[in-house]
UniProtKB/Swiss-Prot annotation:
The gene is rpsB. SUPFAM superfamilies: Ribosomal protein S2. This is Small ribosomal subunit protein uS2. One of its GO terms (molecular function) is structural constituent of ribosome. PANTHER family: 30S RIBOSOMAL PROTEIN S2 PROKARYOTIC AND ORGANELLAR, SMALL RIBOSOMAL SUBUNIT PROTEIN US2M. The lineage of its organism: Bacteria, Pseudomonadati, Campylobacterota, Epsilonproteobacteria, Campylobacterales.
Length: 264
């Protein structure tokens, strides 16, 4: 789990210029240095650990979590961690309706799958060069926008967002559907939009990497807990069944004994 040293080394305490702040973040600010707001890392650490547990527990309950972060500093890092733990993600551009009109998004994913099937079967080679080029361009575009959500069969139970100010459409859709939002909260962000905020820098690459890493580890830990629960439940089930059969045999023996004694 994250430490104060991690937060300092990754520059999580650096907020935005004072003229760009959101007054609602005042409670998370420690002070000002060279016109830059400094975030209170004691509060960051407390919120970080609390949110880590929230995400871990959600994962342990089998809930799905989507990663969202499309800005330049975040997109590659977010994709790396999302793919490493096999969760859906959006790292290029958020398409309107990705949550609120999910059925349409699924249709677009299906188009991508059909084009890939055409490639694999060789059917695409039967087209003219112009037609083939157009279809391959379509595939490239679909994969860029939807590659991270192509295996997502339903809307997520929670979303983890890098920069809620930039990802305002994703945040608005999640709030409309009452999907909990987890996010680092920089000094220019509105804390009222985030269910589980972590006060911190959402612009520096090292800080973003730390947030992605910790949320990924929370999800993995939750999966391990869920697996342990399943194994434990199976063991208990087998034990109960064994004891139950033994009791039945003992009762049957007693009944047979009573019958024999009665016959005598």
């Amino acid at each position: 789990m994250v430490t104060m040293k991690d937060l300092l080394e990754c520059g999580v305490h650096f907020g935005h210029q004072t003229r760009r702040w959101n007054p609602k973040t005042k409670k998370f600010i420690f002070g000002v240095r060279k016109n830059i707001h400094i975030i209170d890392l004691q509060k960051t650490l407390r919120y970080f650990r609390y949110t880590y547990n929230i995400v871990r527990d959600a994962s342990a309950q089998g809930k799905s979590i989507m990663f969202v972060g499309t800005k330049k500093q975040a997109n590659e890092t977010l994709k790396e961690f999302a793919e490493s733990i096999q969760v859906p993600y959006v790292n290029y551009r958020w398409l309107g309706g990705m949550l609120t009109n999910f059925s349409t998004i699924r249709k677009s994913v299906r188009k991508l799958e059909i084009i890939e099937e055409m490639e694999n079967s060789g059917q695409i080679d039967l087209l003219t060069k112009k037609e083939k080029l157009m279809i391959l361009r379509k595939k490239e575009k679909l994969d860029k926008y939807l590659g991270g959500v192509r295996h997502m069969k339903k809307i997520p139970d929670m979303i983890f967002v890098i920069d809620v100010a930039k990802e305002k459409i994703a945040v608005a859709e999640a709030r409309k559907l009452h999907i909990p939002i987890v996010a680092p909260l920089d000094t220019n962000c509105d804390p009222d939009l985030v269910d589980y905020p972590i006060p911190g820098n959402d612009d520096a690459i090292r800080s973003i990497r730390l947030f992605c890493k910790e949320m990924s580890e929370a999800i993995l830990e939750g999966r391990e807990l869920m697996q342990e629960e399943i194994v434990h439940a199976d063991e208990n089930s087998e034990e109960i069944e064994f004891v139950s059969n033994e009791e039945k045999e003992e009762m049957l023996a007693e009944i047979q004994k009573e019958i024999t004694q009665g016959a005598e």
